[in-house]
Amino acid sequence: MIDSNFDIVLWVRMIKEGIEKKNLNPWDVNIAEIADYYIQKIKELKKFDIRLSADVILVAGILLRMKSEALYDECKVEEEEDYDYCDDYYDYDDIEEKPKKGKKKEKEDKDKNKKSKKPVTVDELIKTIEKELNKVKKSRKNREKKTNEVEEIIEELIEEDDISDIIAELLDDLMKEGIIVYQEKFKTREDRVRYFIPSLYLANDGKAELIQEKLFGELIIKLKSF
């Protein structure tokens, strides 16, 4: 018999299965428990050499982050409760009367914050994870696109020009000028890519020194005496 939920995305099925098996409240999901179940399930699937999609692995990371955030919030609540206990234990009436009213209001605010913590339903949890997944995928896609563009430019440049000619040309300019400010000398993206690898070659050969005081800051190519 085929499971009617088989067509549901694997990570969604795993979360729903975890809620059912651990007898969790679907209207107020315990993030820490579902994260632990999910990680354990992944370990079990890997034992059987089952190939897992990138989404399944990414969701594990998202759940772990959500678990750490939930535990941090719980610690903050417990810390506030400890302070409340100390305030109740010590009687400050003998010291000063006025702060008592402020302290009472502060306690009411803390109680209000604790009560205002909204429970997370299983549907809300799944929607939140889907949003996080889309963010990660979009970010990766943009990085891959930029990387591919640079690789294509480098390939085109290598096909068009012999890299040794570019190195010789750069060295000739460097011998005339002594110091080259990379971003000022090479204005276009194509030129910056074209001369970057030759700059590394010259530095590796001990003919030039590359200086960059700040990350992504001004790059200076300085001629070395040889």
Curated annotation (Swiss-Prot):
What InterPro entries is this protein classified in?
ScpA, ScpA-like_C
Key word Iron present: no
Domain of life, per the record? Archaea
**Coiled coil feature spans:** 121-163
Q: Which UniProt keywords apply?
A: Coiled coil
Q: What name appears for this protein in its UniProt entry?
A: Uncharacterized protein MJ1134
